[in-house]
Amino acid sequence: MEEKTKIGIIICDRYHRCAGGKCFRSLRNREGAFSRYKDMEVEVVGYTTCDGCPGGNVEYAVEEMMGNGAKAIHLATGLVVGYPPCPHITYFYDFIKTKYGLEVVYGTHPIPQKYLTMHNKLGTWNDPTWQEIIQPTLVDEKTRLTYD
């Protein structure tokens, strides 16, 4: 039997009441940033918020997730699509990789179409760095619409 891939998910604190429905649906369906786990068994070993700007919980939550076997940390799609998107997301990515040596993935569920439309109007993601950040969750329009 293949060993489970254990992951942690960090969401934006402004969504602290989020039940994770889109994240867990996309994990089950292997959509968005979870498509990387196609044909793999995955276990979520941690799900928490950053604790609000500037993200003080990131330092401690990742350590706990590692203690539960996490090999990858997903910075949830809410950090990417919020208005405004998280100003600390690239720092979180670099910090987790550097301090813990874990794989860090931008996003969880596919970007909903309504967010893509608005961010395109705003020009939010025109920068090459943002183009890299949205890539794992930028799926086809039909799928994006199911996440609206």
Give names to the regions the model predicted.
Residues 96-103:
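Alpha-helix-loop-beta-strand connector modules within alpha/beta enzyme cores
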Residues 77-81, 108-113:
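Short beta-alpha junction loops
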